[in-house]
Amino acid sequence: MPKRDDINSVLVIGSGPIVIGQAAEFDYSGTQACRVLREEGVRVILVNSNPATIMTDPGFADATYIEPITSEVLEKIIIKERPDAVLPTLGGQTALNAAIRLDELGILAKHGVELIGAKVEAIQKGEDRQLFKDLVIESGADVARSHVAKTLEQAVEFAEDLGYPLVIRPSFTMGGLGSGFAHTRQELERMVADGLQSSPTTEVLLEESILGWKEYELELMRDTADNTVVVCSIENVDPVGVHTGDSITVAPALTLTDREYQHMRDIGIDIIRRVGVDTGGCNIQFAVDPADGRLIVIEMNPRVSRSSALASKATGFPIAKIAAKLAIGYRLDEIPNDITKVTPASFEPTLDYVVVKVPRFAFEKFPAADAELTTTMKSVGEAMAIGRNYSTALQKALRSLEKRGSSFHWGPESRSVDELLETSRTPTDGRIVTVQQALRAGATAEQVFDATKIDPWFIDQIVLINEVADAVRDADELDAETLREAKDHGFSDAQIAEIRGLVEQEVRDARHAADIRPVYKTVDTCAGEFPALTPYHYSSYDSETEIVPSDRRKVIILGSGPNRIGQGIEFDYSCVHASFALADAGYETIMINCNPETVSTDYDTSDRLYFEPLTLEDVLEIVHVEQQAGELVGVVVQLGGQTALGLAKGLEAAGVPILGTSPSAIDLAEERGLFSGILDTAGLVAPRNGTAVAIDEAVVVAEGIGYPVLVRPSYVLGGRGMEIVFDTATLHDYFLRMADQGIIGEGKPLLIDRFLDDAIEIDIDAIYDGTELYVGGVMEHIEEAGIHSGDSSCTLPPVTLGRGQIQQVVDAARAIAEGVGVRGLLNVQFAIGAGVLYVLEANPRASRTVPFVSKALGIPLAKAASLVMVGTSIAELKASGLLPERDGSDVPMDSPVAVKEAVLPFKRFRTKDGLIVDSVLGPEMRSTGEVMGIDRDFPRAFAKSQEAAFGGLPLSGTVFVSVADRDKRSIVLPVLRLQQLGFEVLATAGTAEILSRNGIQARVVRKYSEEPAAGDSPSIVDLINRDEVDVVINTPSGRTARADGYEIRAAAVAADKALFTTIAQLTAAVASFDAIRAGFDVTSLQDYAIAREARR
């Protein structure tokens, strides 16, 4: 049937901040939905708390609300905007749970708003573990033996029936949060307690163990006429026991017989019908026992999921876009295929290639965490690759991770076969490389299967890769036949060079001399049956290319690769905006990226998309083919984070024009000695500092500066490897760890700075065109210096800096931009201590705050910067209206205040003892995402940011206080205010004594480490675990920051308590309590823009 005429406006609920298990794929889904709904003439109202998303740009919705995703806020938006319907199926678990809550509270019925995309009954059937289990059994399909428990006592009782080990799965959670395998009653009790806490319905499923079974997924879509398509089958290379988000996956499924696949397909279609998903998509997971072929259904997601984004990129079938159309009444056969233009969406995609996804982990950020992979998702990103066979796709995906040791290698291996096999028994990041090394060392495929339960077919493919490597090594010369064989199995020039004992350029020269270059094939959804009209390409060493020549001037934009802590969706935001701006300016835009989660890898974001690894070899080959197909103006490297910047020198050396800031200028900012010269010339001050490439040098520099010092490697993002070091012994230990990781050495010096304690940190984002500096925004960090800027909350405009100080910051940034030779974006970090402005670092590239600044002040920084890179002046951008005349350094007094807050993943990472890793913040970034609060003043904006990031602050109850000696003076006023607000105060003995002297009565509780006296009260950890504490204030003392109070902080995180580890954050929170009690107003970005124009 045609589009429904009774739906004229739709409220789309986004997924909120990037967290493990719910990442950039929902920005991709939501952006697609907003686009298609507006194309259909539907008024779109969007709510999302994440400013780093493309979907929250005002151009993608008619009313855009960057607000907390809570029932109260959603009702206010509904009252204000009067939507006809709410679409929750494209915003992950966050949106789905929010929609169910609106229904339960009667808010939808009260305001006459319909839920579209999935009915509440369908959501309940798909998400409620018991309902779904009953439904699968009714269909005649099989499930694992299981029980649903709502209490710990029930769980213990059911475990006796099921036996150990068993699986715990909470209801209505995402990314496997709170799930796991329990081998003992002690593990069961801990995991069930976590699971009940994580589940919004307080229930967990206890399931018989299916460890080691093969795992599969189907992506399905269904419309109101009961047309159902299976978009894609996905197979997990890792067996059951590893969360699918942490497993290497392959599409299409490769080890199923046709009969098995058809059986799985029939079950999937029957389930989607019984659940009642009839206006959208769903994902169903299956397991197959390799011993006897028994097939069971594990679970389903009655919404667009993480796997949906992967399936969309793998097939070219835009699941989110089609789901949005189905939600407003279309049938599948009424929706044309964007890629072919002649086939409808009711045609199932067909693949004539193989797609492999490999997860990206960040265990280096959490050294105390247990790195074993389980049913709780721990990866922070993923890379995807497309190849004509599995070995090519796998090798391309592994090198897309950009991690040392992540690709197969053939250098010396010190471990024995037995050691390698034993290591491979435990699923960890990089297990696939351990398997390759074990096979290379002489292990049989059978031994590897016994150790890992990875299907023998996948093991045989690694055997084949090793055989090809042997042939490359043993060849008399590196001839065309040998090279082509290696390339047909995905070997990079660097791998071939390692095997042959050559340098990479020698292999490249030999390959080019033999005229062996990749060709580029097209993702077309139909295995070549119909012509593809969207240029979405992948490389192959076949004979025929599918690149169409063009007479337009081209610009290549390098993306940022897989998400990781320190380099996430914020950089993709800048790449996407550059593509839009350059296309509007008449350039043909070419995107290179390998991240399936992002908007940049949508086939209609750029004129041409290459889904390829971001390595020098892969990028140079694309540059070559594009130069053959027309005029290439240059390559943009300053938007894709350190990934793209790291390729700048190699590209320039190969004669490729780099747009914007030159590689030599980038070096000026990164190389400490050169940058110090620029600061001296400009009369600017940096903290006392030095560099070292050897440990003896480092000790001399550190002792000359005086401890504590801040140490960090060069050329890294997200503060990787950054630490505060208090003595020489710690410096020795630090240096050895960094050197082992290969991030300190010749050409990569260690940077050593005086640590500025009690300083205010400031960020500025700006654009420089060689003549004029245009300030995007000046941000003041709420936490003191020493906490990474990516983890610190910040406010825009600043709330404690005077106009004179802001002007001083702007003047310093201008001098740095001129001295470095910036053309495009510049981010500079400063600190003000004892009245002195210090320059901490300058980055001549996009920063992670660009989206926040753009949303807070309505300045399209990334678009403007991309045009400056191709020669447009800031004066011309002002004249065109793209940039406002008044820049972000001059914010009117009555402007709204925006606060950015970081979201941290501590709850995902536990030690081997089961404790959550320490949540103390420091100079190494550990946040996965961010939220924004915006309102008329700082207290209200901060309150919104806390609501969006952590679910809000309690307005009454019990507060526990235990702080380091240095903070005892600062703690008095905030705690006094909390007591005045009605909080009962608990404290450890030392802190309670200080509070008492200042007129604050506190009940003394013992520390976790103190022995209880006879008849003594419970420890603070016991009280937190009993839910008798609402707010925890615990600041660690400097030298023992990682240990002091750790148990207290771990308990607070596990119990989802409000936790403050800095006085600055606490002070801001206390100031916001009155704002929270008064309630929030909601204002769209479009309304803020109208008010901004009126002020100009």
Swiss-Prot record:
Its cofactor is Mg(2+); Mn(2+). SUPFAM superfamilies: Carbamoyl phosphate synthetase, large subunit connection domain, Glutathione synthetase ATP-binding domain-like, Methylglyoxal synthase-like, PreATP-grasp domain. Mn(2+) 1 binds at Q285, E299. Keywords: Amino-acid biosynthesis, Arginine biosynthesis, ATP-binding, Ligase, Magnesium, Manganese, Metal-binding, Nucleotide-binding, Pyrimidine biosynthesis, Repeat. Mg(2+) 4 binds at E841, N843. The keyword Nucleotide-binding applies. Residues 1-402 are annotated as: Carboxyphosphate synthetic domain. Mg(2+) 3 binds at Q829, E841. GO terms for cellular component: cytoplasm. Residues 548-950 are annotated as: Carbamoyl phosphate synthetic domain. ATP 2 binds at R712, R754, L756, E761, G786, I787, H788, S789, Q829, E841. The large subunit is composed of 2 ATP-grasp domains that are involved in binding the 2 ATP molecules needed for carbamoyl phosphate synthesis. The N-terminal ATP-grasp domain (referred to as the carboxyphosphate synthetic component) catalyzes the ATP-dependent phosphorylation of hydrogencarbonate to carboxyphosphate and the subsequent nucleophilic attack by ammonia to form a carbamate intermediate. Large subunit of the glutamine-dependent carbamoyl phosphate synthetase (CPSase). CPSase catalyzes the formation of carbamoyl phosphate from the ammonia moiety of glutamine, carbonate, and phosphate donated by ATP, constituting the first step of 2 biosynthetic pathways, one leading to arginine and/or urea and the other to pyrimidine nucleotides. This is Carbamoyl phosphate synthase large chain. The lineage of its organism: Bacteria, Bacillati, Actinomycetota, Actinomycetes, Micrococcales.
